[in-house]
Amino acid sequence: MNILGIETSCDETSGAVLCSGQVRSNVVSSQRCHAHFGGVVPELASREHERLIVSIVDAAVTEANITKNDLDVIAATAGPGLIGAVMVGLCFAQGMAYALQIPFVPVNHIEAHIFSPFIQEDPFHSSPEGAFVSLTVSGGHTLLSVVEPDLSYSVIGRTLDDAAGEAFDKTGKMLGLPYPAGPVIDKLAEKGDPAFHLFPRALTSKSQTSKNYLGNFDFSFSGLKTSVLTWLQKQSAEFIEHHKADIAASIQYAIVSVLVEKTIAAARSRGIKSVSIAGGVSANSALRRAMKEACKREGITLHVPGTVYSTDNAAMIATLAALKLSRGMKAECCYNIAPYASFAAGSRMA
């Protein structure tokens, strides 16, 4: 089965082709026009998707060494995301499916991230056999979920305010770093001391290390942003510039340590021995390293996506569509799917 995946939920325009469960192409174009504004401008994002989507899809099909007539199914992000951006990819995908008279599969962007760690040579043979705890962390979402083998899942924790990725970007902006600041902080922090300044770690407690922890798995990062801003305002420009790497490392520790502690506590409290991390922030080297070390101590198997699959991409859209179809979802020629902006967790991905 040949599946075309399309992703346009934010500021990446992507097309990918999956042939018999294997990724044959994954073309991604990241929009650079937003850097000047220090964040994604929704209207600009929509216009860029509209400008690029035809060439991106053509490139994905060509790279896969097939033609559009060889496609069996088309899948696209239906949400959550910037509503205008989602509409571009969704309408294009539905129109293309209608023209080719093939089924269309709408895909939830966050659910696709959850399964992105299993995009390998054969994603279905690398999927965990039992339940796993998924940390999905990006610029717009921070979710902790328990995923069952039948693809049913429940969200057990989420951010109450800002996502972890937003915390990276906004605190980085306070340090004068370019957008997106997350990767810059990651690189800068390699030269810094994470214990230079202890910023607050909200909604954490020593009780989370308990095997019987039954507390709150929610996250909060707005307080961290306020704390960083207040602390920086008390320092001189020379001090900040001289210790920029140390400050970046301290900010990164405050975010990463909370993500790791809550994920491990969730797995431990439920007796689950498999954990995955996904989303743009899963590319952070400190998060990968800390989660790997924590999982090793606990005897937990860690699933992490390749860095190319951490950020938004269409390969994860096509992969989840293929996984749904392999689990019995009926693909239909339905072209009236409406886009949606927010994430509402369902009980089953299929």
UniProtKB/Swiss-Prot annotation:
Reaction(s) this enzyme catalyzes, per UniProt: L-threonylcarbamoyladenylate + adenosine(37) in tRNA = N(6)-L-threonylcarbamoyladenosine(37) in tRNA + AMP + H(+)
Gene encoding the protein: tsaD
Cellular component annotations (GO), alphabetically ordered: cytoplasm
Gene Ontology terms, MF aspect: iron ion binding; N(6)-L-threonylcarbamoyladenine synthase activity
Listed PANTHER family: TRNA N6-ADENOSINE THREONYLCARBAMOYLTRANSFERASE, TRNA N6-ADENOSINE THREONYLCARBAMOYLTRANSFERASE, MITOCHONDRIAL
Organism in which the protein naturally occurs: Pelodictyon phaeoclathratiforme (strain DSM 5477 / BU-1)
Compartment(s) of residence: Cytoplasm
Note on cofactor: Binds 1 Fe(2+) ion per subunit.
One Pfam family, short name: TsaD
GO biological process: tRNA threonylcarbamoyladenosine modification
Cofactors named for this entry: Fe(2+)
Protein name (database record): tRNA N6-adenosine threonylcarbamoyltransferase
Domain of life: Bacteria
EC number: 2.3.1.234
Keywords: Acyltransferase, Cytoplasm, Iron, Metal-binding, Transferase, tRNA processing
Signal is among the record's keywords: no
Family: Belongs to the KAE1 / TsaD family.
